[in-house]
Amino acid sequence: MKCMASDSMVSLGNGLSYPADKIRKVKKIIVGAGGDGGDCSRFLEWATRDFKEPPPKWKGSKEEESFLALVLKADGLYVYAPSFPEPEKVNAPFFAIGTGGEAARVAMMLGKTPEEAIELACQVDGYSGLPVQVLEL
């Protein structure tokens, strides 16, 4: 089963947070993003237009990545950053981004499912929050 999972918490600079969708199924792919909320939203909207238009203008400069995105296709997982000319294939069985990404990767290394990994990451990362969202390819 190929899937993408995410937490639901978006945090603002003033200490406020709210639940939102961070992953989206678009035709035969799944996309997700973590980082600056505005740039994540712009990336997800760009994906719904099949990446046909030029990339949106990102908040951060190319030297400082304001967000990272994942693109799950039938042939594998790809990571995208504003400084990349195109998504780069991840040659690993799984990957995770965002503030809870390291915790989630460790959990998956220990055999947890993506959903379980995010639940655990939410317990140790103050910027990650439930519920977990899961989309299957």
List each language-model region with its residue ranges.
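N-terminal nucleophile
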Residues: 1-137
